[in-house]
C-alpha cells in the first residue's frame, strides 16, 4: 500500500480452490489472535493462540465446482476440481463444470487465448458437461454460466463483508486489491456491489501472494503462558511475568 500511496485496502486473493480476503487500515494489517484451523461444519477446529493476519477464507475459486441440489438450486463450491484434472476446459479429463469454465462460456476469458495461449480450451467438452445442469435448471448454457458467476461473486461478497462491514468498516473508504489467478476476473463486479471506488490489479497478480511473502519484513512474536489462579493477586503476577 505504501508504494502506491494507498493506506486503506481490502485485499482479495482468488486462487483455484479458495478466495481469501483481509483488510488494511491506515497502512496496518489487521491481526487476529483467535484463529482456528480445521474449523468446518463437521469439526469445531483447533485454536491457534498466536498472532496471525486476520483472513477470511472461503471455498470459492477458479476450480470451484458448480452443482445442483435435490431442490434444483444452483451452488458453487466448496468442492473443487483442483489443478488435476482441473476445469473441463483444460482437456485433462475434468467432469465437473467450474467457475473457470463459466467464465469461458460467457467470454469473460478469451477462448482463443486461454492461459496466455498455452492451453487450447476444450469448449466442446465444456458445452457437453454443462448441458445436464442447464436442462435441470431449464436454462440455456450461457444463462447457467452467468448464474454460476453470480453465485461465485455473491460468495466472495459475503467474505468481503466479513472483513469490512461486519467489523464496522465502510468499503467505500477502501480500495480493492485483487490478485491470484482469478482475482482480476471478479474484482470489478465485487467492487461495484460494495461501492468500492477503486480496483487495483498488481503486475504479475497471479503470483502476487508469493511475491508478497518474499518481500515482507521478518517479525518474531514471543509469547509466554502463565498459569495462575484468578484472584486479587493475579494481575500483579501477570504484570511481573
Where are the regions a protein language model picked out?
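N-terminally biased helix-coil "hinge/interface" segments that flank
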Residues: 1-241
